[in-house]
Amino acid sequence: MHPMKKYIALAAAVLAFAAAAQDGPQLNLPRVKLTTGMHVIDAQVATTTEQRMTGLMFRQEMPQQEGMLFVFEYPSQQCFWMKNTLLPLAVAFVDDDGTIVNLDEMQPQTLNSHCSAKPVRYVLEMNKGWFSKKGIKAGTKLEGPPFK
């Protein structure tokens, strides 16, 4: 085989392997403890583009007190969808100081956009109904290491 063809075949195999690796849930991201009032959240932290793009895709279950905190470099309008996401989720768009800007609920396997009402750096996903069951709404403040 010509050396260039070997290189192309190797590159294709590496890309195929990388793509296959995204077919499973992310379970080993760093974690942070967040609180609001007496409620404690054990949140996985997605900071890289790849981690944020995968998010909670492919998860079949998630304990009630767990979630995922998406951290972006700069505040901007953040929009989320539910492609390849099997769990119904609630999403909180969060200001730099931990104040929830707005909330939404998202249905599994849908492509509807759920967007922040203003530019934010943080987005917290929890099981659907988690925020409403705890009386948490826009204006509620989250406490924890990421927030100033």
How should these model regions be labeled?
Residues 1-3:
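N-terminal secretory signal peptides that target proteins for export/translocation
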Residues 5-11:
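Sec-dependent signal peptide recognition
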Residues 12-13, 59:
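Enrichment for repetitive, rod-forming helical segments
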Residues 16-21:
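N-terminal signal peptide c-region/cleavage motif recognized by signal peptidases
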Residues 22-148:
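Compact, glycine-rich, soluble single-domain proteins
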